[in-house]
Amino acid sequence: MAIILDADVLIRGEKGTFNLQQWVAARPTEQFEVAAVTVAEFWHGVERATGARRAKRKQYLQTILASLPVIPYTEQTAYEHARVWAELESAGEMIGYYDIIVAATALERGSKVATFNLRHFAQVKGLAVIEPR
């Protein structure tokens, strides 16, 4: 079962508050991936940054893209996205739209999500969630 890294895991890795490289290296049998929507979130951060910060963020993102497969948003992802969205909305338990897409991507592939935002992702039925340590 692959592990899809949520944006918060990548952000903490970028900021140096979490040693992402060490955590991944300690799990050599695991396949790590990133959802396309997470790449969009990062590009947004790069585009908003200026000067040296922009260059640093861009380099970090390019390193991530060179080392992790990016999982596309497919028609099946769209179905899972709509299903999870409707389920959460009907229950009055909405989470962030990007989080729903990450969850849908994981559900479509039978993957886990690695996140520090356990509270949100735990609301998605059938989703395997792990907190990196």
Give residue spans per PLM region:
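Active-site phosphate/pyrophosphate-handling residues
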Residues: 8, 59, 79, 100-101, ...
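Alpha-helix capping/helix-boundary segments
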Residues: 9-10, 38, 77, 102, ...
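Short, structured coil segments at secondary-structure junctions
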Residues: 28, 66, 124-125
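Active-site neighborhoods of divalent-metal-dependent phosphate/nucleic-acid chemistry enzymes
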Residues: 44-47, 69-116
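Short, well-structured N-terminal submotif of metal-dependent ribonuclease cores
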Residues: 1-35, 46-63
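Histidine- and aromatic-rich ligand-binding microenvironments
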Residues: 5-6, 35, 95-96, 117, ...
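Acidic, PIN/NYN-like endoribonuclease modules and their adjacent C-terminal/linker elements
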Residues: 1-2, 103-133
